[in-house]
């Protein structure tokens, strides 16, 4: 069971150089992803006089996020695993693939990367409007939670199938492409209803910079729940039992 492999982590893990490198990689990858993803919406809105919330704008957002995530995951994969998403990190934690301490370090790096990306967008565009995530008319908070949960389930399930599963083989090579594709497809499916976040960091940065926090909890509860379910389902059904690896207990063990 994945629960038996969940670990808090050793104190030495926080001070280990590899943890610092992984945090920097997550910060940069998330910055790249959010800057390109949110920036594409700002650019489309400027070019079309506020047309980001149109079918064409949705397609542009889907394409930009898919391409940006492909790059962000690729450049971080060999250093941090290329999570670029607190929900993915949470799914990895639930599956026993990362300790709690290291997961929290990843979260801080990802959230900071998103905030810095949004601040840079505001500065670089001369204060252009940055869109915060919100619910469309007729979409309730619980509707959005379910939507985010299902979309993030698909994302984290894809991550497990292509990047985490020890039996993935050559499939691991295309993991960043598959991950980018599922996010792009989900934006086409859910973008018109709640913005299709699937990533608490992507929602957090714009909320901090714009000060718009209405229903922000939706973009945490839905993705985290979906990630946990995906991790448990994939691990229990497809990965199954595997030997528990003792986490390092001293700095010398790393």
Swiss-Prot record:
This is Aquaporin TIP1-2. Aquaporins facilitate the transport of water and small neutral solutes across cell membranes. The keyword Repeat applies. Keywords: Membrane, Repeat, Transmembrane, Transmembrane helix, Transport, Vacuole. GO terms for molecular function: water channel activity. A motif (NPA 2) lies at residues 199-201. Aquaporins contain two tandem repeats each containing three membrane-spanning domains and a pore-forming loop with the signature motif Asn-Pro-Ala (NPA). Belongs to the MIP/aquaporin (TC 1.A.8) family. TIP (TC 1.A.8.10) subfamily. The chain crosses the membrane at residues 24-44, 56-76, 103-123, 144-164, 173-193, 220-240. GO terms for biological process: water transport. A motif (NPA 1) lies at residues 85-87. One of its GO terms (cellular component) is vacuolar membrane. It is found in: Vacuole membrane. Pfam families: MIP (PF00230). PROSITE patterns: MIP. Its main location: membrane. It is a multi-pass membrane protein.
